[in-house]
């Protein structure tokens, strides 16, 4: 009986100590864990700057994605796009990715609207922050959270030699009829493996080296429409949908640069 009482007392003491230890620890919810990377990113990229919460920065993404490798993602910003007042850049962060900085899109008044639709990668459930910078220096931010996983690592897809040979091929099309002096929408499909450097190559049992598009430039009749600095967070075979203003028929041209020195060009006559 005495031994049983001693065991009971020890259990009570251990339980009490455990409860006290838990009470002494700061609460760490899932939401707080997801927010932690963004706090660090703000210090790295926007130290000393004010980011204004902006509901007019619209983000479209699924709450849950079937695959983290190809997650549809779009933003559209309700803001003037005139020579005096426009959104000059939009930065996309996937906070939980190995490389959170996914892309920086640079816009001009000829973009017509600061918007983009594409596909991005998620290594794990993560908030996505979209930061828009106006030409007056003001910064606007909005966010969504997406549940997805496995988009950056895993096994490298397909035949590496075939993927390298096809890299840089492009197709462009206009969404709908040409509208003179109005916002037109273009669709650009790029063949490129967009290797992250974190994918296992089954043939070598090592990691397939990173190989990705790092710069995209779009012009209309030789004038800048938009450009993008991209990284491994953009999905394989990138798809980009964007707008541009065209006052008269001309050529829409795209130039790509990848991290291995490759340069690729594609043009499309519009309105002819």
Regions found by a protein language model. Give the residues of each.
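N-terminal secretory signal peptides and thylakoid transit peptides that target proteins
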Residues: 2-20
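Short acidic/polar inter-strand loop motif in beta-rich domains
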Residues: 135-141, 257-266
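Extracellular Ig-like/FN3 beta-sandwich strand-entry sites
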Residues: 123-127, 183, 247-251
């Amino acid at each position: 009986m005495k031994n049983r009482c001693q065991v009971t007392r020890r259990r009570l003491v251990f339980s009490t100590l455990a409860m006290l230890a838990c009470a002494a620890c700061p609460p760490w919810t899932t939401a707080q864990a997801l927010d932690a990377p963004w706090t660090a990113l703000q210090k790295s990229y926007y130290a000393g700057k004010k980011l204004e919460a902006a509901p007019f920065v619209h983000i479209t993404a699924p709450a849950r994605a079937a695959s983290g490798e190809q997650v549809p993602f779009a933003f559209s910003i309700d803001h003037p796009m005139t020579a005096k007042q426009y959104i000059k850049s939009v930065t996309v962060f996937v906070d939980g990715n190995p490389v959170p900085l996914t892309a920086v899109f640079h816009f001009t008044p000829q973009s017509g609207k600061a918007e983009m639709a594409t596909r991005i990668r998620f290594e794990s459930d993560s908030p996505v922050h979209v930061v828009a910078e106006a030409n007056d220096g003001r910064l606007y931010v909005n966010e969504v959270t997406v549940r997805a996983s496995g988009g950056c690592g895993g096994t490298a897809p397909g035949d590496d030699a075939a993927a390298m040979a096809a890299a840089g091929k492009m197709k462009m099309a206009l969404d709908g009829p040409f509208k003179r002096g109005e916002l037109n929408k273009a669709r650009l499909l790029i063949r490129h493996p967009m290797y992250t450097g974190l994918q296992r190559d089954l043939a070598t049992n090592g990691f397939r080296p990173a190989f990705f598009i790092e710069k995209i430039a779009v012009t209309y009749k030789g004038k800048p429409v938009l450009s993008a600095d991209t990284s491994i967070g953009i999905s394989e075979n990138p798809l980009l949908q964007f707008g541009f203003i065209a006052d008269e028929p001309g050529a829409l041209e795209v130039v790509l640069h990848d991290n291995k020195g490759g340069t690729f060009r594609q043009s499309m006559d519009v309105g002819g």
